[in-house]
Amino acid sequence: KTDTLLPFDIGETDDMYLLNFLPMIRKIIDELRAGRSKAEIAYAFHMTLPVAFLSMADAIRKRTGLNRVVLSGGCFQNRILTEATIAELDKAGFEVFFHEVLPTNDGCIALGQAVCAGAQVKL
């Protein structure tokens, strides 16, 4: 539900997009001070991140035409976050890649970076 989403911004600088979660953090603090349940805030947080990731992917797709998204890293050990992110990206027509053999963690990111670097270097 969109009424459960927390605020975030996407900024652009030097041909890079940046997700700014400062508005989200401020809202979470306000909600905690107002006595909102931690479970509701956690739910809103987990539902907002996939929408933020989709917004970022959409901005990049509009600029580049790229339609593939690769998900990796420690945050995707969280099944709720992973499933919601894949669902949002799928719904928007992205081709989503998620590893099945390697463990979900930063080591997978390092391997991906090495593969990309290797593809650019002619040995």
Report the location of each language-model feature.
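A contiguous, well-structured pocket-lining segment that forms one wall/lid of small-molecule binding clefts
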Residues: K1-L66, I80-A87
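Short capping/connector residues at structural and topological boundaries
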Residues: G11-T13, G107, A114
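Active-site proximal loops enriched in glycine and acidic residues that flank catalytic Cys/His/Asp
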Residues: F45, L49, A57, V70-C75, ...
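Short alpha-helical "patches" and their helix-cap loops
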Residues: T64, R68-G73, K122-L123
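Conserved phosphate-binding/catalytic loops in two-lobed NTP-binding clefts
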Residues: R68-V69, R79, T85-I109
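Acidic, glycine/GT-rich loop-and beta-edge segments that sit at the periphery of enzyme/chaperone cores
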Residues: A114-L123
